[in-house]
Amino acid sequence: MSKYEEVAVHGYEEFCKAVSDRKGKEIFAYFSGDKDEHGKSWCPDCVKAEPVVRAELPHLPEGTVFIYCQVGDRPYWKDSNNDFKKTLKLTGVPTLLRYGTPQKLVEEECFKADLVRMMFTED
């Protein structure tokens, strides 16, 4: 049994529901481009970052929630009016953030295991 809960969601509404269902818990969220039927994202940086982020998951604090969110297809993501950009102020994928704080890693920063681990382990 792992010490954190992982939740996979697709799209903004599912993300919001996952967050509201876990009110009061510390939440880390990873946003990635949608995956195709072969499990490969249209976003090459997401493909590169995911194994780095996953390798650091054991460092998540006990009792936290890790939400893996697919943001949609490329045309949806590129639309500057999508809810992820408008409401969550995301600027790129992949993005790893500590929900409710200004802490986030964007794009190439997610390739760096030391930065990912620092986000998971520092208060």
UniProtKB/Swiss-Prot annotation:
Its main location: cytoplasm. The active site is at C43 (nucleophile), C46 (nucleophile). This is Thioredoxin domain-containing protein 17. Disulfide reductase. May participate in various redox reactions through the reversible oxidation of its active center dithiol to a disulfide and catalyze dithiol-disulfide exchange reactions. Has peroxidase activity and may contribute to the elimination of cellular hydrogen peroxide. GO terms for cellular component: cytosol. CDD domains: TRP14_like. The record marks P44, D45 as: Contributes to redox potential value. Disulfide bonds join C43-C46. Pfam families: TXD17-like_Trx. It comes from Danio rerio (Zebrafish).
